[in-house]
Every structure is written in C-alpha cells, then in structure tokens.
Amino acid sequence: MQFELNAQARTLQGTGASRRLRHAAKVPGIVYGGAAAPQSIEVDHNDLLLKLKKEAFHSSIINLIIDGKKEQVLLRDTQVHAYKPLVLHVDFQRVDATHELHVKVPLHFVNEEVAPGVKLNGGLVNHVMTEVDIQCLAGDLPEFIEVDLSSLKIGGSIHLSQLKLPKGVKIVHHTADDSVVVGIVGKGGASEEAAEGEAAAAE
C-alpha cells in the first residue's frame, strides 16, 4: 500500500512554537537519517491522525512531500496525548533502496477457527506475539507477515523459525531462543496428549 503525506519545513523551534502549531491543527515533527541533516517539519493533524489509524501506515514506506520535494521515509515514533485523540509529535526516518531497514511489522493470524486444536478440541489461541522485528531492503518491506494456524493442535505452537517470510526478509532475533509466536492451549491448560486421550475415550 502506498501512502503520501504532505509536510512543510518548520523554522521556529521550542515549546511555545510547538504549542502554537498544535493550536493551528498542525503536528511538529522531524525527519532524520541518511546523508542529509535532520529537518524539522509540520504536518496536518487530521490527515496524520487518519493515516495513523491504518495498520499498514506503521510498516510501509511513506512518500513524504516536504514543500513539494518528495522523500521516502518510515514512521519511527509518535507522541500522543494521554487521553485525548491528539498527536503531539512525529518522527520519520529517511530510507533508500540500498540500505537494509530494521522495522517492526504486524503479524496476521489466519485459519484460527479451523485449527484442529480449536475446531475439534475447543482450545484457545494464545497470541504470544502480535508483531515481529525484521530486516530487509525498502523494496522488500511487507505490510504484515501471515501466520497460518490451520494445522495447529492442542499444545502445539509456531516458533519464529517456522514463519514463512517473504523473499529478502530476515527475522531479527533478540535472544538465542527460538521464541514462540502463537500456540493453542486447552481451556483448562490441557496438554495435547490429554486432549488426544479424551478424544480416544469418546470414540
């Protein structure tokens, strides 16, 4: 999915200037990275807020148009109000085609309802992770990674090493362990063996 966001260069700095921007429905921000110097910007609040509600915006290359000049960036951070739907600040990082990115992308779980552990044994899906760190070139960046649960039984789980990754995408491991991504557990914590025993007794 392609996203485009218009911005203007920002020259005034400081708390007072940022407050005036917010009163004018603008969000102060910064663009950094690459060979160019960091640049302060301002973007329309409502436009940014609408885009932030879209999951793909957080893990897609964004065409940021600053005073008519296009740069490709990633959303890196947002500061939001504690209880109001207000964006207070936004950070973007420049990207290029030749340098690998390190970014979090969401996991999309499919076929949960037909997984044997759920459909046949009434198990519960336990989502241990909802996103994963990946490394890839900008052109290979996926909006999400799909996790198929169609063959998962009670007590079964899917680990990071079992994820089907798009071409050019690598998982960034933070520990030596092959962490669990998702599993199916019995309603009473039943193991796979116990569930199979109950099924055999029923037959």
Curated annotation (Swiss-Prot):
Q: Which GO terms describe its cellular component?
A: cytosolic large ribosomal subunit
Enumerate the UniProt keywords alphabetically: Ribonucleoprotein, Ribosomal protein, RNA-binding, rRNA-binding
List the SUPFAM superfamilies. Ribosomal protein L25-like
The lineage's top-level taxon is Bacteria
An example Gene Ontology biological process: translation
User: Which InterPro entries does the annotation name?
Assistant: Rbsml_bL25/Gln-tRNA_synth_N, Ribosomal_bL25/Gln-tRNA_synth, Ribosomal_bL25_b-dom, Ribosomal_bL25_C, Ribosomal_bL25_long, Ribosomal_bL25_short, Ribosomal_L25_dom, Ribosomal_uL5_bac-type
- Spell out the molecular function terms from Gene Ontology: 5S rRNA binding; structural constituent of ribosome
Q: Which residues cross the membrane?
A: none
RNA-binding keyword on record: yes
* Pfam families noted in UniProt: Ribosomal_L25p, Ribosomal_TL5_C
- Asked if the keyword rRNA-binding belongs to this entry, the reply reads yes
The family note in this entry says: Belongs to the bacterial ribosomal protein bL25 family. CTC subfamily.
Question: What is this protein for, i.e. what is its function?
Answer: This is one of the proteins that binds to the 5S RNA in the ribosome where it forms part of the central protuberance.
Q: How does it assemble?
A: Part of the 50S ribosomal subunit; part of the 5S rRNA/L5/L18/L25 subcomplex. Contacts the 5S rRNA. Binds to the 5S rRNA independently of L5 and L18.
Q: Which PANTHER family match?
A: RIBOSOMAL PROTEIN L25/GLN-TRNA SYNTHETASE, ANTI-CODON-BINDING DOMAIN-CONTAINING PROTEIN (PTHR33284), RIBOSOMAL PROTEIN L25_GLN-TRNA SYNTHETASE, ANTI-CODON-BINDING DOMAIN-CONTAINING PROTEIN (PTHR33284:SF1)
Q: Which HAMAP family match?
A: Ribosomal_bL25, Ribosomal_bL25_CTC
Q: What is this protein called?
A: Large ribosomal subunit protein bL25
Organism this protein belongs to: Dechloromonas aromatica (strain RCB)
Designated gene of the protein: rplY
